[in-house]
């Protein structure tokens, strides 16, 4: 399982990033990390176009890069949840996004968090990793 999840803010800034999967060498991890960020960021234009043509929060596979697929989920507050993944079940990806959205809402309700700022909470990270293990 190789996947990269990101929460992108309303100003196209990364709020949270998570890389999952086996990569052994540091150099490969660094190059892979930058490539994942580039692929997801380049797909934001597609998400911006699709969000005006659909009422659904979840957008299945919006783009593809080699054997990797990009799925998206747009919240009512225009936060974009992006997932770069190998071919997975669309239902599992949708459930992953829904639980991530619930977790993000709980974070938003914290008086110590400002919207569009990076999420650095270890508890948030552990919960997202748990959700990812369950569905991805």
Curated annotation (Swiss-Prot):
Species of origin: Schizosaccharomyces pombe (strain 972 / ATCC 24843) (Fission yeast)
**Pfam families per UniProt:** Sedlin_N
Q: Does the keyword Chaperone apply?
A: no
- Alphabetized InterPro entries for the sequence: Longin-like_dom_sf, Sedlin, TRAPPC
**Entry's PANTHER family?**
TRAFFICKING PROTEIN PARTICLE COMPLEX SUBUNIT 2
Q: What's the protein name? A: Transport protein particle 20 kDa subunit
Enumerate the subcellular locations listed in this protein's record, separating them with semicolons. Cytoplasm; Golgi apparatus, cis-Golgi network; Endoplasmic reticulum
Q: Which Gene3D superfamilies match?
A: 3.30.450.70
Q: Hey, which family's this protein in?
A: Belongs to the TRAPP small subunits family. Sedlin subfamily.
* Physiological role: Component of the TRAPP I and TRAPP II complexes. TRAPP I plays a key role in the late stages of endoplasmic reticulum to Golgi traffic. TRAPP II seems to play a role in intra-Golgi transport.
GO (cellular component) term, any one? TRAPP complex
Gene Ontology annotations of biological process type: endoplasmic reticulum to Golgi vesicle-mediated transport; intra-Golgi vesicle-mediated transport; intracellular protein transport; macroautophagy
């Amino acid at each position: 399982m190789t996947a990269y999840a990101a929460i992108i803010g309303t100003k196209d800034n990364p709020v949270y990033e998570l890389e999952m999967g086996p990569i052994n060498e540091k150099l490969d991890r660094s190059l892979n990390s930058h490539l994942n960020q580039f692929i997801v960021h380049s797909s934001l234009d597609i998400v911006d176009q699709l969000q005006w043509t659909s009422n659904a929060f979840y957008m299945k596979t919006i783009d593809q890069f080699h054997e990797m697929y990009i799925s998206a989920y747009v919240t009512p507050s225009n936060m974009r949840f992006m997932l770069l993944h190998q071919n997975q079940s669309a239902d599992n990806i949708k459930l992953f996004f829904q639980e991530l959205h619930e977790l993000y809402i709980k974070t938003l309700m914290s008086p110590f968090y400002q919207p569009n700022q990076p999420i650095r909470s270890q508890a948030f990270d552990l919960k997202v990793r748990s959700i990812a293990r369950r569905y991805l």
